[in-house]
Amino acid sequence: MTKSKSYNEIYDNESFYDLEQAIDIVKKASSAKFDESVDLAISLNVDPRHAEENIRISTSLPNGTGKKVVLLVLAQGDKVQEALDAGADYCGNKDYLDKIKSGWVDVDKIIATPDMMPELGKLGKILGPKGLMPNPKSGTVTMDVAKAVSEQKAGMVELRVEKTGIVHTVCGKISFESKDLIENIKQIYNTILKSRPPSVKGQFLEKMSISSSMGPGVKVNINSIG
């Protein structure tokens, strides 16, 4: 039996499903031999070329992402120990800037204190394409490094609109209980709704689909999310 045929027996890819149904389908369609991530694709009625509509926000998921987040904090003085005490995997300044210049980027997130940004900004060509450049909007440029580390480790996700007007984000793992995925998705949904720019006319959040890493996208009836 082909994968597409087995998927077709589980759901109709043209239909919209209530959130709980959609999650159930994603779980049934998952056949990978590892704990797949569960991903959301959210289509917004925005034009990211306009600064006001270029949405970039963060939120903490109540049940985490299920992923171990490897963090680098770029800081100086007592902020180095503060970050390490909070759980940062790596922390330093010039030594790590030099490592990044040499091509080392074996981390999931970088947090930086504001004083590190002038030097870090010079590495934009390395960090930018990988989505690793710290940004105040996402809470990764801050003096409160302990809080930032704790939030990232607990399951902070960045919600950033792409050129196509779509936000892609992880919302958990296939092994999560359905209720935990629902709570995470509602948190993402409500956070995005609150970020609606005043310039947007008509419906803001247009479409949503949910999938596992290796599975098909299932369309969600956004009216079923409250």
Describe each PLM feature range.
Residues 1-12:
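Generic N-terminal amphipathic, Lys/Arg-enriched alpha-helix
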Residues 11, 15, 23-34, 48, ...:
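Structural signal for hydrophobic packing residues in well-ordered secondary-structure cores
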Residues 19-81:
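Translation machinery proteins
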Residues 22, 83, 128, 210:
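Residue-level signature of catalytic and energy-coupling elements of molecular machines
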Residues 34-38, 195-207:
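Flexible, glycine/charged-enriched surface loops at secondary-structure junctions
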Residues 42-44, 75, 114, 171-173, ...:
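Flexible glycine-/small-residue-rich
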Residues 65-67, 77, 162-165, 201-204, ...:
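Short flexible coil/turn linkers enriched for glycine and charged/polar residues
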Residues 88-193:
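Long, charge-patterned amphipathic alpha-helical coiled-coil/hairpin "stalk" segments used as oligomerization
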